[in-house]
Amino acid sequence: MNRKDSKRKSHQECTGKIGGRGRPRQVRRHKTCPSPREISKVMASMNLGLLSEGGCSEDELLEKCIQSFDSAGSLCHEDHMLNMVLAMHSWVLPSADLAARLLTSYQKATGDTQELRRLQICHLVRYWLMRHPEVMHQDPQLEEVIGRFWATVAREGNSAQRRLGDSSDLLSPGGPGPPLPMSSPGLGKKRKVSLLFDHLETGELAQHLTYLEFRSFQAITPQDLRSYVLQGSVRGCPALEGSVGLSNSVSRWVQVMVLSRPGPLQRAQVLDKFIHVAQRLHQLQNFNTLMAVTGGLCHSAISRLKDSHAHLSPDSTKALLELTELLASHNNYARYRRTWAGCAGFRLPVLGVHLKDLVSLHEAQPDRLPDGRLHLPKLNNLYLRLQELVALQGQHPPCSANEDLLHLLTLSLDLFYTEDEIYELSYAREPRCPKSLPPSPFNAPLVVEWAPGVTPKPDRVTLGRHVEQLVESVFKNYDPEGRGTISQEDFERLSGNFPFACHGLHPPPRQGRGSFSREELTGYLLRASAICSKLGLAFLHTFHEVTFRKPTFCDSCSGFLWGVTKQGYRCRECGLCCHKHCRDQVKVECKKRPGAKGDAGPPGAPVPSTPAPHASCGSEENHSYTLSLEPETGCQLRHAWTQTESPHPSWETDTVPCPVMDPPSTASSKLDS
């Protein structure tokens, strides 16, 4: 027998000892460190102690929490179980019921240990309110039960127990507040901060997007996460809905900013800029905004722009491919999870992926065992995942933010474009071509929008506040002398900075030649924002309810308004009348009458008319696109990002008028064939 046969025989003997060829050998690791997941699992089992073997009833769990305190209020043992119960009990038991059980236990305490047990219960309630002060403000029933508890303590308890309920810091909000915006260092009175998109550095833009993302992420509470897991929707959770809406708004903003440029080379420059922004977001470990920006760049309305992508450099195309693969949903976001596990320091997760994990954990196991006891291992696993997210909210961002640039981004993200509108503009920029085209530089989008459709419209009050904040920032940086006006050049640059209807709208009437006042800029941005955000032109009217004592007709539907039962609304500024149900459907812009209340113009100034915009065509650089606010009425308004000629004489360009081409039908397939 040679050495080779000897090795084969020895190998067969070894395999036979473990059950022959039919049974696979058990894979064992030798002299290797356990993975972080294994360490967390073991630590969780140790923290649960004997209860990890099964479950326990609500009374047993409550008793364990009470016995965690001594007479001085110190914890007798490790506080993991106590913190887990206080944070997770609402998943299986309402907080008001838990407080009622504590009140009952306090009232039933008798015997030699009565004072000690009551003192322990008071320490537990105080500890609960100090660690989770937000639950009192979000649950009126819990607030009522806690009030009865402290009233009982004040009536039946001793001085030591009453002192625990007298502290004024019981309901003080815990945790770090949102990061404070900081102005750029060295900002002098005469220095301007550029508020133009083309002038913003990619790193600066990424930092401000990270600030907005972190501020939105900090507002999410464990109660919001629980509500999402139990209901399967972000509706009813304003903070969580706002975070999802911010991500979707960033994605839409990226798409519209790319499509706002008339030529392929200009669109390629915007694409390249956002690719560098995405790379900077990756360096900042802001994966949630990175997902939004990359998703916008990989959207089919953008990926079909082959003429634009042809101008991208190979390095930019490669970088976009790498980011797309990093955030791809293949194998349950395996590449992102590996990257996230190796991150340290400041980082922001892809919220949708981690919420998906919470849902999976919740659905995988029941809340209670067959005998009715609570399933503690499940609650503990959920608690560990929630604590990871809560710990991330206590981070300190590595970058500061300029308040003026935040106002610019906030108003820019207050857009509300539908998928159909974005596709129509995409086809208007690069129509379908029957000739064969080179393949797209990257595949169909791999990055998915985890909560599609959650892009809430800004309400009138919020939008007005954002406009006022931006106007303040504009005049602070573009009018350092305090003259109260900005130049026409600055106005044109600012109006072209937004992806909503600015270029196609009639500019505000100027009181002085070549300058625009604060009121003119405010009214202009309000009018453009109202159209873009689908709030309607009624947003610009100041309606008040009136009773018409003489025959009047509605300016919206031409219906009759007369009598006590025919109350309607009249605009204080222009006198327009309409029904209550027609108020939000007004298609006439508010024209302030001379001498009317709130008129910003000089006395006797003529009211400027707004002629209907006429079409322009010619080269692809001047290709126009029209959006119908009311398709059935044919009311057409031009969008800002289309570079069309203006009806105002001073804004006319050298283009040849021709009929407007109808945009491609959106009923067909949205993917470029």
UniProtKB/Swiss-Prot annotation:
An example Gene Ontology CC term for this record: cytoplasmic side of plasma membrane
Membrane spanning stretches: none
Localization per Swiss-Prot or TrEMBL: Cytoplasm; Cell membrane
Keyword Cell membrane: yes
Function: Functions as a cation- and diacylglycerol (DAG)-regulated nucleotide exchange factor activating Ras through the exchange of bound GDP for GTP. In neutrophils, participates in a phospholipase C-activating N-formyl peptide-activated GPCR (G protein-coupled receptor) signaling pathway by promoting Ras-mediated activation of PIK3CG/PI3Kgamma to promote neutrophil functional responses.
Family statement: Belongs to the RASGRP family.
Stated name of the protein: RAS guanyl-releasing protein 4
Source organism per UniProt: Homo sapiens (Human)
